[in-house]
Amino acid sequence: QPSITGDLVSENDLVLLVMPQDIQAPKGRLILPQVQTMRELLDKKCLITSCTTDKLPQTLKALAYPPKLIITDSQVFKTVYEQKPAESLLTSFSVLMAGYKGDIRQFVEGASAIDRLTENSCVLIAEACAHAPMTEDIGRVKIPRLLRKKVGEALHIDMVSGSDFPKDLSKYDLIIH
């Protein structure tokens, strides 16, 4: 049976969820990957605690022992990594969901295509989410900025969302979904 957290944790393991307040989620709500992950951890009989990024130091200090696993949002991964106990594993909700809903080995192999990109390459960024793009949207702003910084400003990037997926993908050197 597919599992979000796989064999990363087992019964009685302490798991810390670091969840910045997502501007996509209405006040008083959590985003679906957070809810699904918490439900699975409860079903596995793990001990779960959560905090926002700004409360991470106080939360770690309040714990009797370091968490086995820390799960956070990709946007604060570096911040959490810099503060986590050395013995705690760290992953993100996005990585867990990618492994749960897709072929994580294929995704890792696909990511290696980034190293082969040149300024003449063509990249497709296909967003499946239906939310309205935000100012610093990861798919429309952050990923293109990082790719152009690595490869060069002339890198051609096409952006599609929802069901607006091109039929012919042959011109693309990399597709990010």
Which residues make up each language-model segment?
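C-terminal-of-GTPase-core extension/linker across diverse P-loop GTPases
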Residues: 1-139, 145-148, 153, 159-174
